[in-house]
Amino acid sequence: MQRLKSFYLETIIPKLKEEFGYVNSYRVPKLKKIVINRGFDESCQNSKILEVLLNELEIISGQKPIISKAKKAIANFKLKEKMPVGMFLTLRSEKMYSFLDRLINLSLPRIRDFQGINKNCFDGSGNFSFGLSEQSMFPEINFDKMIKVQGLNITIVTTAETNQEAFFLLKELGIPFRD
């Protein structure tokens, strides 16, 4: 079992029950999934660059991403139908906890002048989204093989009903929030 998951089960669940007064264990908020999204511009239409970005996301997450394609052509954006516009993947269960553990303990501390993540990024339903400006902070990425600096968006979906519940859950899991 992942270290972060066992920490959640043994330590965080009792704290959440005490803090919010849950009687039923099934009402306690938990992580549902983590969605990693990466969009790209027209310079990434080159198949080599696209393949490198795909491999980077696969190395970071341990799972192969799905390429999202344009549904219709838009001339102003120089976009053709079925042209790749981004990639995403959804992590659940063990891979989700593994990725979150590596993100909190290895990747975020490697960001230069990191002050913490803005805590105003909740959506009102207990989900938390934030963006990272570059992929080089992940220890799995070889800086020499990196062709293009490309950011990614991470959404952490929880079963929490309010932002306060989700904030308490993520704070206890160890996500460094800005004060």
Swiss-Prot record:
It is found in: Plastid, Chloroplast. Keywords: Chloroplast, Plastid, Ribonucleoprotein, Ribosomal protein, RNA-binding, rRNA-binding. InterPro entries: Ribosomal_uL5, Ribosomal_uL5_bac-type, Ribosomal_uL5_C, Ribosomal_uL5_CS, Ribosomal_uL5_dom_sf, Ribosomal_uL5_N. Signal peptide: none annotated. One of its GO terms (molecular function) is structural constituent of ribosome. The keyword Cytoplasm does not apply. GO terms for cellular component: chloroplast; ribonucleoprotein complex; ribosome. It comes from the Eukaryota. Its main location: plastid. The keyword Chloroplast applies. One of its GO terms (biological process) is translation. Belongs to the universal ribosomal protein uL5 family. Part of the 50S ribosomal subunit; contacts the 5S rRNA. Binds 5S rRNA, forms part of the central protuberance of the 50S subunit. HAMAP family: Ribosomal_uL5_B. This is Large ribosomal subunit protein uL5c. It comes from Euglena gracilis.
